[in-house]
Amino acid sequence: MKKITVVGAGGTGHTVAADLRMRGFDVRLCDSEVYRGILDRTAADGGIRITGMMENGFAKIGLITTDTAAALKDSDLVICCTIANRDEEVAEMIAPHLRNDSVVLLSAGSAGSLIYRRVFDRYGLANTLVGETCGNMFSCRLLTERSEVFTGS
């Protein structure tokens, strides 16, 4: 089973993590200490509920953490679902824990792959593949009072 780490505790990160888990992937969800409250609530709820236009259901996420090293251990794919002004911060957060053959995808990219590439090169990760989407993967919103995402078309 492919191991996928989703970085980003907002609506997109929760939606991507839940969607991939419901498709059968081994998913981990992580973010920095700033987002500990959201991650702790999701962990306490046991996972993420999706409602709205996508397949509705509940996704039990294997690991929900602020421990980046644990979240990235043995990952086949890293999907970063954070806002553009966090690109350098997130790249610096994950770089020490990546393999040189890691694959990192940004959603939504906004040319963030250029920033990630620069950071990864400083860490000697020349063979790490970085890609990005041209827009957000999903139209979604995290309902802050519970671990639920509402998805649109």
Predicted feature locations:
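Alpha-helix N-cap/loop-to-helix initiation residues
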Residues: 13, 35, 71, 87, ...
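A general structural motif
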Residues: 1, 24, 75, 100-101, ...
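Short mixed-charge
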Residues: 46-61, 127
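Conserved anion/nucleotide-ligand pocket segment
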Residues: 147-153
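Rossmann-like NAD(P)-binding element
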Residues: 54-105
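NAD(P)+-binding Rossmann beta1-loop-alpha1 motif at the extreme N-terminus of oxidoreductases
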Residues: 1-53
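Rossmann-like NAD(P)(H) cofactor-binding subdomain of soluble oxidoreductases
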Residues: 84-147
